[in-house]
Amino acid sequence: MKKWFLVCLMFVTLLALADGHGDLGLEKRQPDAPMNVTSVVLGEDVTSVSAEGDMEGYGKVYVTYHLSYNAARTGGTVDGQGRGFTPDGYASGRFQGFWELVDGVVVMRNVVNITDNTMNLDVIKFNPLTRELVVQAYILK
């Protein structure tokens, strides 16, 4: 099952690497969501980035990204989870994907499985110089 998921994840990631997400015909789930980076923990094998912000449909969101490095240390895999809280309750999501360094910006592309039985392709851009982090969420399911 895990291998099947990784194969599907790689397929979706290859699509995400194409220029222009509009070309894929994916619809945005919500407006782009700027987040406040609350911590960056550097490690030899993994760096963790935590952020919080408001997202349409999910409320106040807290998320942590765990980035593992490739041999060149310019990309690798990413996994993590997030929680969103609204007056009506909460949602939880787990994600896996890949990241790369593009012109000094960390670009993550993740498949997100959310407890409300929805699935997103999230494209996250994190600029370590300015601490800007923006989440673009596209509907997969």
Go through each PLM region and give its residues:
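Positively charged n-region of N-terminal signal peptides that target proteins for export
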Residues: 1-4
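Hydrophobic h-region of N-terminal signal peptides that target proteins for export
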Residues: 10-17
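Beta-strand-enriched cores of mature, soluble protein domains
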Residues: 18-141
